[in-house]
């Protein structure tokens, strides 16, 4: 009951953003730097998709202009209100032709999906990426060891994503396709950690 109330509150874009600032201070700067570094190693992409975009794309901070896709109509409406195209849809059945995008991104989505759906979503992202393009996935992972990062462990346990994984478990979701390169790093003052992974098609 309490969880449902919290989830409904997080449907409001300003509460969604505020919760991120409170629970993950410093995350925006660190993650932006990491992704910026990664972009220097990747080919230029013109047609970009952000899967699980939320009410606004993280990629906007990097002056990228993706099409957004999210299961929440509230989020895609807000995304569209900012002047960018967005589609309401499911990550495990992306409504695009094979090879349609130069790059496909997913930031903070997979821990909201059970293993079978997450695997299918990754498969779909690769399917709609053109040969020579790339897929980038960033997702949270459980702290290891938990006792060294108690604040991060607690935040992860309270996360509305019900499928928070260890690094090994997240990498196993990706392992159906060979060639993923992943980097684990801490990205907030509360000790939150994530895995930034790229796949060149």
Regions inferred by a protein language model and the residue ranges of each:
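Class I SAM-dependent methyltransferase Rossmann-like catalytic core
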Residues: 2-33
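Class I SAM-dependent methyltransferase SAM/SAH-binding core
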Residues: 49, 54-93
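A conserved beta-strand element that flanks and buttresses the S-adenosyl-L-methionine
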Residues: 105
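A short glycine-rich, Lys/Arg-flanked "PGG" loop and its adjoining helix->strand segment in the class I
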Residues: 119-131
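Conserved beta-strand signature within the Rossmann-like core of class I S-adenosyl-L-methionine
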Residues: 132-140
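Short, glycine-/aromatic-enriched active-site segment of Class I SAM-dependent methyltransferases
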Residues: 144-160
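Short alpha-helix
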Residues: 162-178
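Conserved S-adenosyl-L-methionine
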Residues: 179-190
């Amino acid at each position: 009951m309490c969880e449902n109330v919290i989830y409904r509150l997080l449907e409001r874009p300003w509460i969604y953003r505020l919760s991120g600032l409170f629970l993950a201070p410093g995350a925006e700067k660190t993650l932006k730097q990491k992704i910026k570094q990664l972009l220097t190693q990747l080919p230029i992409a013109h047609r970009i998709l952000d899967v699980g975009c939320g009410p606004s794309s993280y990629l906007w901070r990097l002056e990228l202009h993706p099409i957004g896709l999210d299961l929440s109509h509230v989020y895609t409406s807000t995304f569209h209100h900012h002047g960018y195209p967005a589609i309401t849809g499911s990550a495990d059945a992306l409504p695009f032709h094979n090879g349609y995008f130069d790059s496909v991104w997913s930031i903070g989505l997979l821990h909201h999906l059970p293993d079978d759906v997450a695997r299918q979503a990754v498969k779909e992202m690769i399917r709609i990426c053109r040969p020579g393009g790339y897929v980038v996935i960033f997702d949270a992972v459980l702290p290891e060891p938990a006792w060294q990062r108690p604040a991060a462990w607690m935040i992860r346990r309270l996360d509305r994503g019900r499928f928070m994984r260890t690094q090994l478990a997240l990498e196993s979701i990706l392992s159906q396709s060979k060639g993923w390169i992943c980097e684990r790093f801490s990205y907030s003052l509360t000790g939150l950690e994530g895995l930034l992974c790229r796949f060149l098609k």
